[in-house]
């Protein structure tokens, strides 16, 4: 190889060396810029996904908290009635629960179940007996939760006593936030989560009061709302305790555990984060089998319910790093154009300013030596000084 280089002309050697040096320098500069761009883009993307997850969590948590606040307020009103000796007749219950449901913007149904000994003047049509519990069940529906009015009482359906939140509230005698469930009442099905509080007369449990929060509304306004999209093909999922889908872009996932839908080991860090009641950003393989980045925000529903939900905002890395591909192409074109321009200009300079002048000097010297050796009769013409540099002096 060295032999081949020695055979090259001076200008070619110089051009080759300059080209290699320029290419290496530009390449290093491009790699540094690429690395810094990716690092910055990665940091900003993770920050954005985390902030978006936090923003949605800050929208959803108040919905649930509002429901519990209304329930506990009504719970307090009923307790005060009992302390004052006011009978819990149909009118009192109707007014209390109707006001509760009408105030809520997210609940579709509210219900109160009073054990048989504590329901005064209960209507026979409201009497239910199920799961070893007997009493009077009153169910109320709000036809339009976003507006005042529209609340009315509907027929009692004993399936309400099958709600896990109702059963747990009776057994544990505390406020319970249930699991995502598909509810069918009055022949209409919808996705919901139940919030239930116990009712006491002194220290004696006399029944429960609950609401069915309409998750379909949350899905439409938050999960499926395209205005909430930050990257192409991203999606929002709301996970209840245990990583169960409460809302997602695919309604068929409702009620399923995320770990059952996506069995890739990388998902473990997300399920662990929810189990530890923490938030963060994680790189993982999403349920579509693509590399993704997910922002997770975990929050507790109300106070001391022990129910922790999470919002997962996931975006494929191909979408997150899409700007980087544009930067890379632009950089590559710029590097090649710069390299070609620099090499062309330097080659032109070497050929005109160095090689041509060196050739003239070399020819003049050879002719001068011929004159000294009497190989020619007349002296060669002297060189013209065209530059005040090493070759021109």
Model-based region annotation:
Residues 353-380:
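Membrane-proximal alpha-helical signal-transduction linkers
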Residues 15, 19, 33-63, 67, ...:
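Juxtamembrane interface helices immediately C-terminal to a transmembrane segment
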Residues 83, 101-174, 178-189, 244-264:
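Extracellular/periplasmic ligand-sensing ectodomains of membrane signal-transduction proteins
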Residues 188-225, 247, 293-297, 307-323:
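Conserved beta-strands of PAS-like sensory domains
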Residues 4-48, 332-340:
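Extreme N-terminal signal-anchor transmembrane helix of membrane signaling/transducer proteins, especially
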Residues 90-104, 208, 212-254:
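Solvent-exposed, extracytoplasmic
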Residues 200-201, 261-329:
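Extracellular/periplasmic juxtamembrane segments that couple receptor/chemosensory ectodomains to their
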